[in-house]
Amino acid sequence: MVVHFAFLFHIYQPPVQIPVVIKQIVNESYTPIINSLHNHPEAKITLNINGTLTEQLHDFGYDELIEQIAILAAKGQIEFTGSGKFHPLLPLIPEPEIKRQIKLNNETNRHFFGRIYSPKGFFPPEMAISEEVLDTVKKSGFEWIIMSGIANILPEFPTTYISQDKNSLNLIFRDDYISIDCAFDKINNVDNFISRLYYKNTSEDYYVILAMDGETFGHHVKHAIKDFLIPLFDNVPNRNDVKICTISEIIEKFPKGPKQTPRASSWSTMPYDLAHDVPFPLWFDPQNEIHIEQHRFFMYALTLIHLAAKYRESMDQEKKDIFDNARNLLDRGIHSCQQWWASARPWYNTDMILRGLNEVLMASVNAKRSIPENVPDIKEAMELIMNDMLKAQNKIILSL
C-alpha cells in the first residue's frame, strides 16, 4: 500500500506590496524552495503563482528566478495552475470579471514562462469557490480545481477516487488538518509528517493533498525549508510506502467517483461560519461594516468601468489611454487582501485597506475622465454613482 501525496504551494503578493517585503520573501522563501527542487531531481510540487507576482519579480529584477521556475516546469518538477491574476475573491465578482482575471493571468504567466505554462488545474484565490466559479473555470478549459476539504459534501472524504461536479470538472479537496498543521509549524519533521499521512487503516492506495502558502516555507516558518522540506525531499525517494506527485499525476492514477456540488467556502471557512451562512468570512462578513462598504465600493467602480467601456470606440487616443489605465487600476484594485486585512480575525491593517481602496478610487476617477465630451449625460450619471461611492469610502475611512 502506498500513500500518494502532492504539495500545492500558492505564492502571491498583492500588487500594492512594498519592494522591501518582496525582496525579503524572495530571499527567505522563493529562492530556497526553487534551489531545493533543483537539488532534488525526484522532488516535485504543484505551483500557483499569480501573474501579478510574476510581474513583480520581473520588475524588481528577479528574472533568473522566473527562468529557474520555468526550467523546473520543463523537467516535470513543477506543475503550474491557473488562477486570477490579481488574486480577487472570485465568488464576489461577476462572471465577466472572473473570466477577465483568468485570461490576464494566463497571458501574463505565458509571457514570462513561455509555452511550458499550460495549466490543467486551477487555484481559486483563497480557495474561495461557488457553483458559478466552478462553471466559469470549466468553461475556461481547466480539467480540475482545488478547494478546501470543508467544501466536500459527500459522506466519505475523497482519497481513493476523484470526485467531479455536474460538468465533469475534477474536484480536488485539500486535507485541511495536515495542511494547516504544516503551515503553523505543528508538523516540522519527516517522521511526524509521514505518520500523519498514514491516518487510514486500509490496504489500498490512497492520496493526500497538501496545500498552503508557499511563503510558509522560510518566511512565515523560518526553519521549515532546512528542517522539514529538504529532509523530506532527501527521504521520500528511498521509501516504498509514500510517493510524491503532482496533483495531475494523482488524478491520472485514481478512478473517477461520485459527483457532487461542493459547498461555497474558502480555505479559511470554519464550520461555525457555514452554520451562520457566511461562506467567505474573511472577505464578506455581513456583520463587518467595512466588508459591506468595500463590496459596495467595488461594485460602484465596476459599474463605472463597464459604463465607460461602452464608449471606448468613440474615444480619441488620449481618452482611450485614460480608460485603459482605469481598467488596469480596477483589475489591480479588486485584490482580496484589503478585505482580509479588514476582517480583524485577527488580522487588521489600515494601510493595506487604504492602498486597495485608493487603486479602486483612481480607477473610478479615470473612468469618468475617459468619457468623450459629446456624451455629457453619461458623465452626469457617473457623477451620481461617484457620490454614492464617496459615501461608502467615507464610511470605511471613518471606521478605521
PLM feature spans:
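Generic structural signal for well-ordered alpha-helices
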Residues: Y30-L37, I66-A70, K99-N109, L134, ...
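Short, well-structured secondary-structure segments
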Residues: V3-P94, R100-Q101, K120-P124, E143-S148
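Active-site and substrate-binding clefts of carbohydrate-active enzymes
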Residues: V2-T31, H38-H40, D165-L169, D176, ...
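A short acidic (Asp/Glu
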Residues: Q17-V20, Q56-G61, P91-P94, I129-K138, ...
